[in-house]
Design a protein with these regions (language model features):
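Active-site capping/gating regions of soluble enzymes
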Residues: 206, 220, 228-287
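Catalytic alpha/beta active-site cores
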Residues: 1-235, 256, 262-264
Length: 287
């Protein structure tokens, strides 16, 4: 279907496109007016033809879900929020938890957790809560994920809660507790986007950070890493960025002898190009 989509239209040569653009420019220089170079050093033309098409060896995700965040206040209230989101076909839900203890039976009452992903963002990695979540996941075959980025938190704040060595040891112990979680690290590549890194820097820094997690916690962590990516305004470049993440993480995982079928990516709109003054502008910039 893709190859025959435009078969009813006559093909137009690259030469014709260039002639038409030069005519429309009314004497202005073609190269300086419509060609430009991105921050990544990519020379972008005003049009591309099949001549520039590369091999179609893309990694397509198995599926995708709409995501939403909620903040846990009262378990019964949050239960209603989750049920409402599910009716709206939101199947990835991040729950921010600031409490020291939670009643999971009330929070997830009458909710089938086998087909939705629940991400837990804890203010503090409370051992009691994590242990309860792990047992609940084991009992109910839940798709639980830990939204935590040990190195990313340090990157964004500049401080360890205690010190580097103690934080690493503590997280190693936590990994022994949450053995029934589907993922345990949500690497915030978004930190680099929000700090002004270009796409190549975002990808390379994120892969270095992911590899450092492998060095710290062993190669088995590979299948338990998610990537949170902040999406900018350059539509095609952002598509290429996400595709590059998939290719590189699969390449790295293969080099460690742990092949993965799907790279788990959480895509969010970047805050870097947003304004506090105009909601409609922000909506357009995220489209």
């Amino acid at each position: 279907m893709r190859s025959n989509l435009f078969k009813e239209f006559d093909s137009i040569s690259e030469k014709y496109w260039k002639q038409q653009i030069q005519f429309d420019l009314a004497g202005k220089d073609f190269n300086s007016e419509v060609n430009w170079t991105s921050y990544e050093g990519v020379n972008v033309k005003p049009f591309f033809t099949d001549k520039y098409k590369s091999a179609n060896n893309f990694f397509i995700p198995e599926n995708w879900n709409i995501s939403q965040e909620i903040y846990l206040t009262e378990e019964s209230k949050s239960n209603k929020e989750i049920k409402k989101l599910i009716t709206q076909e939101v199947y990835d839900i991040t729950i921010h938890i600031h409490k020291k203890n939670i009643n999971l039976d009330i929070l997830f009452n009458d909710i089938d957790l086998t087909f939705i992903n629940i991400y837990f963002k804890l203010e503090d990695l409370n051992d009691l809560i994590l242990s309860k979540l792990n047992e609940y996941a084991k009992k109910n075959k839940s798709q639980f994920h830990l939204d935590h980025d040990l190195l990313g938190d340090y990157l964004s704040s500049g401080n360890w809660k205690s010190n580097y060595k103690e934080e690493v040891i503590r997280f190693k112990n936590i990994l022994k507790t949450i053995t029934h979680f589907k993922s345990v690290i949500q690497l915030k590549s978004s930190n680099f986007q929000e700090a002004g890194a270009n796409i190549l820097q975002q990808i390379s820094y994120s892969m270095c950070q992911a590899n450092e997690y492998i060095n710290l916690f062993g190669s088995t962590i590979i299948k338990q890493v998610n990537f949170e990516i902040a999406v900018g305004s350059n539509y095609f470049f952002e598509i290429a960025k996400i595709q590059a993440f998939r290719i590189l993480w699969k390449t790295i995982s293969n080099s460690y002898g742990i092949p993965i079928n799907n790279v788990h990516i959480i895509a969010i709109p970047t805050n870097r190009n947003k304004t506090i003054y105009d909601y409609n502008n922000n909506l357009i910039r995220s489209t």
